[in-house]
Amino acid sequence: GVFNKEGKIQTPHLDHMARQGMIFTDAHTSSAVCTPTRYGILTGRYNWRTPLKRGVLSGTSQALIPPNRTTVASFLKYNGYQTAFIGKWHLGWDWALKDSAFQNKPVRNQEIFDKIDFTKKITNSPNGLGFDYAYGHCGSLDMPPYVYVENEKITAQVENITERKGDYHWWRKGPTANDFDHERVTPHLFDKAEAYVSEMNEKGKPFFLYLPLPSPHTPILPTEEWKGKSGLNPYADFVMQIDHRVGRLNKLLDELGISDNTIVIFTSDNGCSPEAKFEVL
């Protein structure tokens, strides 16, 4: 690829973006993992200015960004843009709890799932940080609870407890909604993104879409049509699947006639996953 001439994973669509656009080859981060990177992207601030000095939040952590903090979404919304978040949030939001005595306490342990009231709205959500539309899940795909939240409400009932083990495909045990299929999350989020872009174009609205993917983070779950495509391992298959969907999204911008008036930024929030077995890549 453009960034690694010795890399074995085929990423033609990302390579095309890089060749046609601007690439950043001297980037630095104060913490190369999910939560602090997302915090920096949305706020323009160093992660160590938050209470979280290192590491990441869990799926039940409280909101890291205070509601009065300016984000790129709130800035663009103020300037007339429609704004949307679709994907993996991993910046915390506040679940409603059955017992208010637990409401202001750290919620990181397994027992907290019994205390969450999934019938009520979340608070301190992406909607309160400048996003007109917000759809996604709370943390990484290996962090419960496994539910989609759309504009502060879960989209389906939590009826299952799921867990999976394995080198590539593992996720932690936790509550799972009946519309949440781990393997289909990445394509589902891209489908939602394509629908949003089409809707905004039809309405003639300028828009900002923040699409933070859960992939290729663990669990590494390429869909059936991508399994074995790389000839390397499941992680490489997963990256190829992402590349394909990025290409499809860019093609949609072309078909709608808005690609010349749209800035597309693709970046990573992590280095390569240890589960990727990167020595073969």
Language model: regions and residue ranges:
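Formylglycine-dependent sulfatase
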Residues: G1-L281
